[in-house]
């Protein structure tokens, strides 16, 4: 059992590890056993959080030219549909290089606009890099290997996830931006947000809110160094209230259009189960701007806001400005005019291109 805990709200909560970590560990173990001709029971991997995991290897299967094994997903106290699921990797020797494939129970992306290209297995960018890094660390220099990730119960479990709504078929996604699962109970998460805001407010007169790791990466990659970033998950309204309670009057919110656009409709909890109006916001603005209804329908047919942005291309800067201005207006109303707000809105997971920055923003000055 993974022995890492966080404390929140007076409760001790156990962390877990992602399907991405499981896939990377299984792939590394299978590769090691294939080329060293011996079984092992535990494998160590690193994670993007620089936390090392020592994971127990299960169900080793040796064939003529390949070896496969599994790692059991442990979600800690954040038990979701994939917790307890076996994530397998099969390693086969090839002439040279590294290849990564998706097998049984790993979903296939069928729509544009996700973080993985259409037709590819639903193995997200960070897990892909983790798998490659760990495999290459044990692959002999003069050898090549093909890794196939497969999840025997993946097709069944995927029905309990959001994959069907996203156009990901026939299995689960291999996910995780940090490699670690932190307990996400609402009470615990809100308390941790409140504590971080209070801590950051001690030495800062302004705060920057991001929804998750991607938002923070967006800032750091552009040279932002101040220690005033708070990850607020989906709790925009709650976080604003906490900041105001600490006397913070200047707030910048940095986020993907899929999150920020919801605020334009007055949604201050941006979780998809609470508010899912991303496409409607874009469609409404296009309609108000006088664009053809055929284009509006195409936007509404997309699975994600990412897909809508890619469909529209780079010819709609006024659209994002209008959405941004409505977000700012909603924020001002929510805070009763007691704070100054700025926003930075982007799209993409790798390129993370800026769509809109409010006029008074000075994060990079």
From Swiss-Prot:
EC number of the protein: 2.1.1.195
Name of the protein: Cobalt-precorrin-5B C(1)-methyltransferase
BP term (GO), one: anaerobic cobalamin biosynthetic process
Catalytic reaction annotation: Co-precorrin-5B + S-adenosyl-L-methionine = Co-precorrin-6A + S-adenosyl-L-homocysteine
Protein species of origin: Clostridium perfringens (strain ATCC 13124 / DSM 756 / JCM 1290 / NCIMB 6125 / NCTC 8237 / Type A)
Matching InterPro entries: CbiD, CbiD_sf
Molecular-function GO term, any one: cobalt-precorrin-5B C1-methyltransferase activity
Family membership noted in the UniProt record: Belongs to the CbiD family.
Pathway annotation: Cofactor biosynthesis; adenosylcobalamin biosynthesis; cob(II)yrinate a,c-diamide from sirohydrochlorin (anaerobic route): step 6/10
Superkingdom, taxonomy of origin: Bacteria
EC category name: transferase
Keywords carried by this UniProt record: Cobalamin biosynthesis, Methyltransferase, S-adenosyl-L-methionine, Transferase
């Amino acid at each position: 059992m993974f022995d890492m805990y966080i404390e929140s709200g007076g409760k001790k909560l156990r962390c877990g590890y992602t399907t991405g970590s499981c896939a990377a560990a299984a792939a590394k173990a299978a590769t090691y056993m294939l080329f060293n001709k011996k079984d092992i029971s535990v494998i160590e991997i690193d994670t993007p959080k620089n936390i090392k995991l020592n994971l127990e290897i299960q169900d080793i299967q040796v064939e003529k030219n390949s070896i496969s094994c599994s790692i059991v997903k442990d979600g800690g106290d954040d038990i979701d549909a994939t917790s307890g699921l076996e994530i397998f990797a099969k390693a086969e020797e090839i002439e040279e290089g590294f290849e990564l494939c998706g097998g049984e129970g790993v979903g296939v992306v069928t729509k544009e606009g996700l973080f993985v290209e259409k037709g590819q297995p639903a193995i997200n960018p960070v897990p892909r890099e983790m798998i490659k890094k760990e495999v290459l660390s044990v692959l002999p220099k003069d050898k090549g290997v093909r890794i196939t990730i497969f999840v025997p119960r993946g097709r069944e479990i995927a029905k309990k996830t959001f994959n069907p709504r996203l156009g990901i078929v026939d299995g689960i996604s291999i996910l995780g931006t940090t490699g670690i699962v932190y307990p996400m109970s609402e009470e615990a998460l809100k308390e941790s947000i409140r504590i971080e805001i209070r801590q950051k407010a001690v030495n800062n007169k302004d705060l920057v809110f991001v929804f998750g790791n991607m938002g923070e990466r967006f800032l750091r990659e552009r040279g932002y160094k101040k220690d005033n970033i708070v990850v607020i998950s989906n709790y925009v309204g709650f976080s604003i209230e906490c900041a105001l309670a600490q006397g913070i009057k200047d707030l910048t919110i940095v986020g993907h259009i899929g999150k920020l656009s919801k605020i334009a409709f007055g949604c201050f909890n941006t979780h998809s189960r609470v508010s899912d109006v991303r496409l409607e916001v874009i469609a409404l603005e296009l309609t108000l701007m006088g664009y053809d209804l055929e284009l509006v329908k195409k936007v509404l047919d997309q699975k994600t806001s990412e897909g809508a942005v890619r469909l529209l291309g780079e010819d709609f800067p006024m659209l994002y400005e209008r959405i941004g201005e409505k977000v700012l207006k909603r924020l001002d109303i929510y805070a009763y005019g007691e704070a100054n707000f700025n926003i930075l809105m982007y799209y993409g997971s790798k390129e993370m291109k800026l769509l809109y920055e409010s006029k008074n923003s000075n994060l990079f000055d």
